[in-house]
Design a protein with these regions (language model features):
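Class I S-adenosyl-L-methionine-dependent methyltransferase catalytic core
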Residues: 1-212
């Protein structure tokens, strides 16, 4: 936002990430008259800070349900690369009960729906909401987080406009073919989704559902 001379506000549960953001914002260009704020608070409270129909764009990469809340085994990496600095570590950002990264997919989807229901009235009509997310494997099952998010946001009044695939080939080049040679399993870590929604141009009720 600073590079584009746009006003922006960001939220995070962890003070250390807010502090990091503020330190980077302190390095912005001298003649940049736009303002960017970093606030330490829950996403569920964002509507307390902003007025209705004042937001032109929401961009976020929420936790991928409880994907990171387990020890990393690095099964997709070759040989010695498996036991890197991440091996057997739990990389979940926090264990706070407010953190979406501690939730199983069903509870996660319900919380996401409620958060975005509160955000919808803040958007201008036709304003965009872009969510970066990936799917995951959990107990040998493919969890389609991007499908859950699409359904959740549609239920509270958003309209899906596009799905963009973010190719992460640079990471794929460093890993093997998972399961080779006994079997082949496609790897979800090779790409992520950019889910492009907007607030529909027709009126939206106060609870976030379209009035049509």
């Amino acid at each position: 936002a600073a590079d584009c001379y746009r006003n922006a506000v960001g939220f995070d549960l962890q003070e250390k990430y807010v502090a990091l953001c503020k330190s980077r914002l302190g390095q912005q260009q001298l003649f940049n008259s736009s303002k960017q704020l970093a606030i330490c608070d829950d996403a569920r409270s964002i509507s307390e800070y902003l007025q209705p129909e004042t937001v032109s764009l929401i961009v976020t990469s929420p936790p991928y349900a409880n994907l990171l809340n387990r020890r990393r085994l690095n099964k997709s990496r070759r040989g010695d690369q498996r036991r890197n600095d991440q091996y057997l570590k739990i990389e979940q950002y926090s264990q706070e009960n407010r953190d979406l990264g501690t939730l199983a997919i069903d509870d996660y989807t319900k919380e996401i729906a409620e958060i975005y229901r509160r955000l919808l009235p803040l958007l201008n009509p036709k304003a965009l909401c872009v969510i970066n997310v990936t799917d995951m494997w959990w107990e040998n099952r493919r969890i389609t987080i991007h499908v859950s998010l699409i359904e959740a946001l549609r239920q509270v009044g958003y309209e899906l406009r596009n799905i963009i695939i973010w190719d992460r080939t640079n990471i794929v080049n460093q890993i093997g073919i998972f399961g080779w040679p006994s079997n082949y399993i496609t790897m979800g870590v090779t790409f992520e989704y950019l889910l492009d929604f907007w607030r529909p141009p027709h009126d939206v009720s106060s609870n976030g559902a379209p009035t049509s």
